[in-house]
Structures are given as structure tokens and as C-alpha cells.
């Protein structure tokens, strides 16, 4: 959700900013803009829509500089248009600002300090830049004015400020929104994530909440709000820039679906010791083993992965587990056990709702574990422990390889805890994950069959239903989410046994119903549910597993361990959803109104 880049050095800032914004497209946005500073002042380029349109406008101008900031906006205050796009300037034109986040008290600040100011936008952001201008006119130096404003703000923010009277500085601050400082020789950068500015550096410094950062060409100075210098080490962003390119694929989503076998192999390698045994840091295992109940907190696809993880943890490790939607949990915390452990699942490690829960559970002193794809992310830094997905950059908004990686890591964690508890299981997990890897490869190779299924069942429909029982129900939720978010088909996932309690009333002639049948103990039951909907005119698509398949099934996945079937069956749904969106000529990688990383509550 939204993205910030900034550059100060000696090179062409305009081009570097545009390239940086292009790397942030995956986060989701509806407008974009940059500001570049030269001897003649600050030049703004802003456009509603795609960055390609912004580039056309910027490339048609000779204006350039060696200092600038850029922004992709996902509208929260005010509609997507030129006036509401970032960067924003103060009325005097002296100050220019980009901002991610939501300022909760902007109306109060506007009324108290800026009643005489004429605003050009509907945004909370413009209040910030006008306040800096206001306090500078009261005689405060820019850094002091900026700090004073930051102290007044309530809410989430990542800020990058330029002062036209000081062409050698970017002023930076953050709270609850991600922002990094990248360090180079003769230049420095700021970015919402490291991927944005890998073109310039892979050396970064973390910024903590409530800090002021003074970024110049040759120095980076970090202070707390009282002006005390804070020491901060530089770390290397372990990202291969080539991993963030589409390569031979038409879309990032298709590439990331095809990468899942390689991700499985990488996870097997990373979580295996030299003797071929599963390994996870002993401190993590001890904290998980000591817990009397586990609370998984997540959102969207990560929540669905958590539902599958609950099956592993309870059936293998024997630890009672609850799975909660982060945005609900933070406002309605349930009664907790005496020794809870919280597991936060987030591809980006920046999900605002999950972080809000983590802040509260940290206050209560509860142990926490983050499962994420991004080392050094906010959730990773603030939790007690982290398990990495090792999935590589996931650029498409619709998550695919992160989901399967999350499930794989949860399975490994559960098996190790089970062993720690003295619970013997009949699962050779590394061997079973290797079988899963081969099964995924088979499905990926069958992509033309998935395309045909999308054509046969979904090309003209406006609605679709996914049904399953037990663990297949959890996967049906993810299948429905994938389809709705990229094809815009109204899709819902249901427990097969719930059909007769209301949903079956929605079945009409030709309604596609995709059923999952990978669990032996409910195979007959889910097939009975499919007969119920067929009797009412539904168009059935049955996805089953070898050994449980029946004549007439639409597609049969290779046989794997029954608890690991989500890792395989979901790939069919990912591909079917991809082709359904493609057939409707939609933007598969950047669906409307959605953001990859939801960094505001």
C-alpha cells in the first residue's frame, strides 16, 4: 500500500526515482508522482493511473536534479486525482512532502494551526507539509519544525521532506509504516522496501518508530525526538535483483506459480541439518513447546495458510491452536491461556493489523514468532523469533508461492515440536515434502489443462463457489480468494456440509461449483454435496487426488500425504484463477483496488 523512494547524490535523480517507483508497483497504487530539485527550485511531476503515464510526462521535460523524492499513492483520504497525488507542497512552495500512512488527528491540527491556509487537496498529507511551513515561519529551523510536527501527529506515517532552501537534505521520519535508508558512496536513498532501490545499493539502515533521520549525500544521522543521536548498523539486503524480474514469463503471478517447486526445495535445504534432520533454532522450539495454546494471527492468504497450519500443530504437535483475523483480534482480543504463544504470518512482515496485535501482546509479555518472507521487516524485528520463507521476492499482488511456503514452514515447525513433545508421527516430512515438490511440478506442467478448465467453467460466469471438507475447506477459501481478487468473479468458499444451510439457495443453472476431494474420511461426503448442487443445475468441477478419484473427475492431483494436500491442490486453483483473469483481459499482477502490502489499519 503506497510506496516511497528518495535519492540524494550526484546522478540523475528523476530516472532513479522513476525506476524505484516501478519496483514498488506491486504494492498497489492509483496515482504516482516525483519531485526533483535543482538550482531553479523543485519540479513536480504527478499523474493519476500507472507509472508509465508519469514517465511519459517526466521524460517530456528537461527538468532534472540530483535530489528528489517519489511516491505511489493508494487513496485513503480523497479520490485519486492530480491534486490528491503526492508529492504535496506547502502553499509557499518551499516544502515538498511524501507520506505513507493515515494521520488520525489531521482535522484537529488543521483547525488549530492552519485555519487561514488555503488547501489544494483533500489529503491528510497536505496538513503535514503545511504545518512544517507554518512552524518554519514561526522562526524554527527546518529540522526543529519537522520534529515538532512529528510530535503532534497521531497515527501511522512514513515521511520524506524536502526544503527548497536546503538542497542537500532529505528529512525522514516514521511510525508504524515501513521505511529504510539505503547507504552508498556519495549518495544515499530512502525506500519503503529494499527492492525499490536495489539499482543503487543493497546496504541499508533500519529506521525505528519516532525517529528523525537527516539524510545527506555523504551522511545519515538518526536521532530520537529529543535530538539524541542513535547509532545504527548497516545491513545487507539479501535480494537478487534478477529474482524481481519477470524473465520469460508474461506475468509475475505465472512466474511465481512456476517457482513453487524451487521454493519447496529451498525450504527443505534451509530447514535441514548436515545429518538430514529437520532443524529450527532451539530457542524457538523451546518457546513453542512451552506454550499451552498457540494463537495464529494473520490476514488474507496468510490467514488461510494459518488455518492449514492449525491442522499440523494440533494433529502432530498436540498443541491447541486458534487462528484469528488480525483486524478483528486487535479490537476484540479473546480470553488468553496462561502461557500463550503468538505466531504472526505475513509475506511482507509489514501487515499493519498484525503489527497492531503484536504491539499489544508485547506489552503483555507474551512470546511471539513471525513467519515472513522479508528479513528485517517490522514484524520480524519486533517479534521474539522469526522463521523465514526463503521464497524470494513475490511481486504479484495475488500471493501464490508465499502461501505454499508458509504452509511448508508451519509443517516443519509442527514436526519438530511434536518430536520435542515426544509425540511420534508416521510422517517422514522431508521425504513427503519432496513428493509434494514433484507433484507441484506435475501440475505446473499441466498448465494447459488448467487453462481449459478456466475456459470451460469460468469464462462467462459472474459467480463461482468452492466447496471442501476438513482441510479441503481451508483450501477452498484460498481458491475463492484467488479467483475473486484477480478475475473479479464473485467467488466464495464454503464447507460442504454448510451448503444446505443457506448457500444452496444461490445455485442456478450453470453455476460453477469447484469441489475438492483429497481427504479419504470425507470423500463420499463431499461427493454427496456435489450431487446436491448438480441436482439444482450447478456445473461441477471436481478436483480429487489419486487413490480417491472417481470417473468423471475434472482433474486428479498426484497422491501426497493427506495433511500436505493443500500444498498441491491449491496450485490447480492458482492456475485456474490466473487463466480466468487472462481470458477476461485483466491486469493479473495488479488487480484493481488491491495492494500487496497492507501497511495501514
Swiss-Prot record:
It holds the Pfam family SIS. Gene3D superfamilies: Glucose-6-phosphate isomerase like protein, domain 1 (3.40.50.10490), Glutamine Phosphoribosylpyrophosphate, subunit 1, domain 1 (3.60.20.10). The active site is at residues 2, 596. GO terms for molecular function: carbohydrate derivative binding; glutamine-fructose-6-phosphate transaminase (isomerizing) activity. Residues 2-218 form the Glutamine amidotransferase type-2 domain. GO terms for biological process: carbohydrate metabolic process; fructose 6-phosphate metabolic process; protein N-linked glycosylation; UDP-N-acetylglucosamine metabolic process. PROSITE patterns: GATASE_TYPE_2, SIS. InterPro entries: GATase_2_dom, GFAT, GFAT_N, GlmS/AgaS_SIS, GlmS/FrlB_SIS, Ntn_hydrolases_N, SIS_dom, SIS_dom_sf. NCBIfam families: glmS (TIGR01135), PRK00331.1 (NF001484). This is Glutamine--fructose-6-phosphate aminotransferase [isomerizing]. It comes from Staphylococcus epidermidis (strain ATCC 35984 / DSM 28319 / BCRC 17069 / CCUG 31568 / BM 3577 / RP62A).
Amino acid at each position: 500500500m503506497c510506496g516511497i523512494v528518495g535519492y540524494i547524490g550526484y546522478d540523475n535523480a528523476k530516472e532513479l526515482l522513476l525506476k524505484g517507483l516501478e519496483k514498488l508497483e506491486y504494492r498497489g497504487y492509483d496515482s504516482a508522482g516525483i519531485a526533483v530539485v535543482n538550482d531553479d527550485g523543485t519540479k513536480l511531476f504527478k499523474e493519476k493511473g500507472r507509472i508509465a503515464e508519469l514517465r511519459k510526462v517526466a521524460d517530456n521535460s528537461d527538468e532534472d536534479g540530483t535530489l528528489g523524492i517519489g511516491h505511489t499513492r493508494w487513496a485513503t483520504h480523497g479520490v485519486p486525482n492530480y491534486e490528491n497525488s503526492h508529492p504535496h507542497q506547502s502553499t509557499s512552495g518551499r516544502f515538498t512532502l511524501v507520506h505513507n500512512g493515515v494521520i488520525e488527528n489531521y482535522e484537529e491540527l488543521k483547525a488549530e494551526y492552519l485555519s487561514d491556509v488555503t488547501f489544494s487537496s483533500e489529503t491528510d498529507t497536505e496538513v503535514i507539509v503545511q504545518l512544517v511551513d507554518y512552524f518554519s515561519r514561526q522562526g524554527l529551523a527546518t529540522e526543529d519544525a519537522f520534529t515538532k510536527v512529528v510530535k503532534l501527529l497521531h497515527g501511522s506515517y512514513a515521511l520524506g521532506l524536502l526544503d527548497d532552501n536546503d538542497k542537500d537534505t532529505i528529512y525522514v521520519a516514521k511510525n508504524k509504516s515501513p521505511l529504510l535508508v539505503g547507504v552508498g558512496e556519495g549518495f544515499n536513498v530512502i525506500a519503503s522496501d529494499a527492492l525499490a532501490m536495489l539499482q543503487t545499493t543493497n546496504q541499508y539502515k533500519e529506521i525505528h518508530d519516532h525517529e528523525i533521520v537527516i539524510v545527506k549525500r555523504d551522511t545519515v544521522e538518526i536521532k530520537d525526538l529529543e535530538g539524541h543521536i542513535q547509532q545504527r548498523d548497516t545491513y545487507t539486503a539479501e535480494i537478487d535483483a534478477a529474482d524481481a524480474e519477470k524473465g520469460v514469463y508474461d506475468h509475475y503471478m505465472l512466474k511465481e506459480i512456476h517457482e513453487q517447486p524451487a521454493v519447496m526445495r529451498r525450504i527443505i535445504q534451509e530447514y535441514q541439518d548436515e545429518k538430514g534432520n529437520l532443524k529450527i533454532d532451539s530457542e524457538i522450539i523451546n518457546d513453542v513447546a512451552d506454550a499451552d495454546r498457540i494463537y495464529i494471527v494473520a490476514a488474507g492468504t496468510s490467514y488461510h495458510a494459518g488455518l492449514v497450519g492449525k491442522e499440523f500443530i494440533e494433529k502432530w504437535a498436540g498443541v491447541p491452536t486458534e487462528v484469528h483475523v488480525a483486524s478483528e483480534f486487535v479490537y476484540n482480543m479473546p480470553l488468553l491461556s496462561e502461557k500463550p504463544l503468538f505466531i504472526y504470518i505475513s509475506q511482507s512482515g509489514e501487515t499493519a493489523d498484525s503489527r497492531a496485535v503484536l504491539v499489544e501482546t508485547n506489552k503483555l509479555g507474551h512470546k511471539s514468532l513471525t513467519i515472513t518472507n522479508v528479513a528485517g521487516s517490522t514484524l520480524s524485528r519486533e517479534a521474539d523469533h522469526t522463521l523465514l520463507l526463503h521464497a524470494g521476492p513475490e511481486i504479484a499482488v495475488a500471493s501464490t508461492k508465499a502461501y505454499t511456503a508458509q504452509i511448508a514452514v508451519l509443517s516443519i515447525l509442527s514436526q519438530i515440536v511434536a518430536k520435542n513433545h515426544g509425540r511420534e508421527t508416521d510422517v517422514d516430512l522431508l521425504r513427503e515434502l519432496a513428493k509434494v515438490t514433484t507433484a507441484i511440478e506435475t501440475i505446473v506442467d499441466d498448465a494447459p489443462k488448467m487453462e481449459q478448465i478456466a475456459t470451460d467453467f469460468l469464462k462467462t460466469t459472474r459467480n463461482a463457489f468452492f466447496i471442501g471438507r476438513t482441510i479441503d475447506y481451508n483450501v477452498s477459501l484460498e481458491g475463492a480468494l484467488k479467483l475473486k481478487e484477480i478475475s473479479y468473479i464473485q467467488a466464495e468458499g464454503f464447507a460442504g456440509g454448510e451448503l444446505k444451510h443457506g448457500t444452496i439457495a444461490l445455485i442456478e443453472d450453470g453455476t460453477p461449483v469447484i469441489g475438492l476431494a483429497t481427504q479419504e474420511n470425507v470423500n463420499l461426503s463431499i461427493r454427496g454435496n456435489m450431487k446436491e448442487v448438480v441436482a439444482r443445475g450447478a456445473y461441477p468441477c471436481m478436483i480429487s487426488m489419486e487413490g480417491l478419484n472417481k470417473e468423471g473427475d475434472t482433474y486428479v492431483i498426484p497422491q501426497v500425504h493427506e495433511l500436505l494436500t493443500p500444498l498441491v491442490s491449491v496450485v490447480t486453483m492458482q492456475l485456474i484463477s490466473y487463466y480466468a483473469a487472462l481470458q477476461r483481459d485483466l491486469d493479473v499482477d495488479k488487480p484493481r483496488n488491491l495492494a500487496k502490502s497492507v501497511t495501514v489499519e
